[in-house]
């Protein structure tokens, strides 16, 4: 009997060893996240540098998109697109620009103050908890390290990386965009929040992941990654602009081309990843020429169309000195666990179809896309089916360029609700705020009966008296 027990235990142990060696264990899955970064170190100027397991290093820049939502300023969209093109040109070969726009549904919380009057306090209490969408924008500058068996420290490349970081910040400052590099503590928290997909709460925790073909489970929530372009059947319009027109009261108004990502039903958090890879231009032009010759050698309608398209791209590059870049765009949509993911899927497909973009329906590598969308880890994206070649100007049109309406920095604040229904402070004089719009204080209030003229004038008079404005 003892011999049988010993043989049974031995067979059980051998089976467990074979099972672990073949199928792995939970620790093997955990390494997917543990080995994302070797470390996060702080350099001069309190700039955090993230070192990935592949040897790439990166820094995260927090900015504010310059275009105000519903501003109807077409030039502003083009100016920001051109500014990002300048950043890409400055970075050059071997770098990647990873822009992340984080959209979070929050409940409105009024500013705490002990000096408010009863009516003002009641006004803000009325809007307390009203849901609205907040947008935060981060840009990660990534330098690729040549992959090999051993990664060696290159002082020249490291120095070039630090110089490029300063140049990018200067370019943004010249374009009127305030920016700040995250320090070690801020970068660590940002990476953790990306992993937890939680940006609304001050305190958060990480949970387990359950990856499937169409979504990833995260405890009481789940998320789905939508890739904007399917490289096997690219569905993009022939002509793309940084904005699109919508109809409002029988009049057209320009909005951001990617404005649909802010209106996904049921989503609590959305991260729009926009990645631009900068390749060797000569190498890519030679590959294009080779591809054109290959298509020309087999004359049929589809090949002739391909030859014409390549010729047009070559002409644009030669005449206008444009750049070839590789792009990847995806949206991480996080919803409560009981949400039917077909609803946001249908909304995105319908919205993008209206502007001529057919999003990919074959994103089966959900966990791979999620992990490779972490800041600094973008070079792990598969070169064959996660990146597509295009001109830099076209890629910049797919960037998100807007920010939500914010309260003006002014001592003279008159509150009105924005299009989301939450209060924002407006300086109606245009001369008291940090941003001066005029030096003329003369104005009049015009409106039909019951539109709030008396309330507006009372608010203006009271604020003017409180702040001693003239």
Q: Where are the regions a protein language model picked out?
A:
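Pre-P-loop entry segment of helicase/translocase ATPase cores
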Residues: 389-399, 404-423
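Glycine-rich phosphate-binding loop of nucleotide-binding enzymes
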Residues: 73-77, 81-89, 101, 410-470
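Extended, folded cores of ATP/NTP-driven motor/assembly subunits in large transport
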Residues: 3-401
